[in-house]
């Protein structure tokens, strides 16, 4: 059964400006600018004044209607990113060989050494807009921060996958770098 019209609204805060061109959304706030294209979805994205954004779908089935909630959630995450920002904390887990992690190039590159006793250096370049630093308060922890939740999550997933032990039982060999905490940064 098709629903004639399905709509969701996103409230825009005072210090954020949103520009909509077709199905592309650009969000600007105190921490920077994020943009995203929703060309793959057949929805109408419109600004209602300066305080509200609506996402409409006409004659959609269940999967298309579910896409509306996804799009509004992504836009809300973009608004949170440009106003407050996001932070992920990752912990090192090892049984015998201590993992050495160095953050280089101004927080843009993570180098993993002595992983499972290996002599090679695993080098991971972070995505644009993501910075990393070692947490001085906690042992064996790095902190990644950024405005885009998607890019930050992808950078953490890349670090976790690059530090995974292949061809071994993951229940027994737990060594690696894992996300331990996810936070929204408080506005300064």
UniProtKB/Swiss-Prot annotation:
- InterPro entries for the chain: Ribosomal_uL6-like (IPR000702), Ribosomal_uL6-like_a/b-dom_sf (IPR036789), Ribosomal_uL6_a/b-dom (IPR020040), Ribosomal_uL6_CS2 (IPR002359)
- Gene Ontology process terms (BP): cytoplasmic translation
Per its record, what are the GO molecular function terms? Answer: rRNA binding; structural constituent of ribosome
Q: Which GO terms describe its cellular component?
A: cytosolic large ribosomal subunit; extracellular matrix; phagocytic vesicle
SUPFAM superfamilies named among the record's database cross-references? Ribosomal protein L6
- Record PROSITE patterns: RIBOSOMAL_L6_2
Which Pfam family would be a valid example here?
A: Ribosomal_L6
Keyword Lipid metabolism assigned to the entry: answer is: no
Q: Which UniProt keywords apply?
A: Ribonucleoprotein, Ribosomal protein
Q: Which family does it belong to?
A: Belongs to the universal ribosomal protein uL6 family.
- By what name is this protein known? Large ribosomal subunit protein uL6
Organism (species): Dictyostelium discoideum (Social amoeba)
* Gene that this sequence comes from: rpl9
């Amino acid at each position: 059964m098709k629903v004639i019209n399905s709509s969701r609204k996103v409230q825009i805060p005072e210090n954020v400006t949103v520009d909509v061109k077709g199905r592309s959304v650009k969000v600007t706030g105190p921490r920077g600018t994020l943009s995203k294209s929703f060309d793959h979805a057949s929805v109408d994205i419109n600004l209602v004044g300066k305080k509200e954004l609506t996402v409409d779908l006409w004659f959609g089935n269940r999967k298309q209607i579910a896409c509306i909630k996804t799009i509004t959630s992504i836009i809300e995450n973009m608004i949170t990113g440009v106003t407050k920002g996001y932070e992920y904390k990752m912990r090192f887990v090892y049984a015998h060989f201590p993992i050495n992690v160095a953050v280089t190039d101004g927080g843009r590159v993570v180098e993993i050494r002595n992983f499972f006793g290996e002599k090679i250096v695993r080098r991971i370049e972070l995505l644009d807009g993501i910075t990393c630093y070692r947490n001085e308060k906690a042992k064996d922890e790095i902190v990644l921060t950024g405005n885009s939740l998607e890019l930050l999550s992808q950078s953490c997933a890349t670090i976790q996958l690059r530090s995974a032990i292949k061809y071994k039982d993951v229940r027994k060999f737990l060594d690696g770098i894992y996300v331990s905490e996810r936070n929204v940064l408080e506005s300064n």
